[in-house]
Regions:
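Acidic, glycine/GT-rich loop-and beta-edge segments that sit at the periphery of enzyme/chaperone cores
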Residues: 160-173
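Nucleotide/phosphate-binding catalytic cleft detector across ATP-hydrolyzing
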Residues: 1-62, 83-84, 143-144
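A short acidic Gly-Thr/Ser loop motif
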Residues: 56-73, 78-80, 126-129, 171-173
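Short glycine-rich, Thr/Ser-proximal phosphate-binding strand/loop in the N-terminal lobe
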Residues: 74-104
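Repeat-based blade/solenoid architectures
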Residues: 152-157
Length: 173
């Protein structure tokens, strides 16, 4: 029953002009009884997800690693607390990962991301991270950092993003 939908947020990897056209046409075809339809990229979803976590998880840099087909895509969020409002910076990188589930290659990537950096937390998303192949790389990531594994971070971030649009709060300032 589409009458019960108050708002809808869709998140996707890249939100370019073409994707926006496709999503707008698709949601228009749903004939929803709401004008609260929004779209955001995975980068924005990662930002909103972090905002709604305890501050100690994003006090320093926060890293997300997304396991893809033959690569690991990473997002690194850092907040400048010396500005008002606080400014968040996001850096996106992609690392080739030609050998599936290589602990050695993952540790190499982890070191590139974390060495000489203050990292509060690391999020590992993608089904492959749930399997039991990361021994040394996971041990490295867990030293002085909180590490989380799951697959719903972008969808939760989309929900938080919509909440912030509907009722802006202190969290988003």
């Amino acid at each position: 029953n589409t009458e019960r939908i108050g708002a809808l947020m869709i998140t996707c990897e890249e939100l370019d002009h073409r994707m926006l056209e496709v999503l707008t046409a698709a949601t228009g075809g749903l004939h929803l009884k709401t004008d609260q339809i929004c779209f955001q990229s995975h980068v924005e979803s990662f930002y909103y997800y972090n905002l709604y976590q305890p501050e100690e998880l994003w006090r320093h840099k926060t890293i997300l690693c997304e396991y893809g087909d033959a690569s690991i895509r990473t997002y690194c969020m850092e907040c400048n607390r010396h500005t008002t409002p606080v400014v968040a910076y996001m850096e996106e990188r992609e690392f080739p990962f030609p050998v599936p589930e290589s602990d050695e290659k993952m540790q190499e990537i982890a070191k590139k991301l974390c060495e000489n950096q203050m990292i509060s937390s690391v999020y590992l998303i993608g089904e492959a991270f749930s399997r039991d192949w990361m021994k040394e790389s996971l041990r490295y990531l867990c030293k002085g950092r909180r590490v989380f594994q799951g697959n719903n971070l972008f969808s939760k971030g989309a929900c938080y993003g919509m909440m912030e649009r509907l009722t802006p709060g202190e969290t988003g300032k």
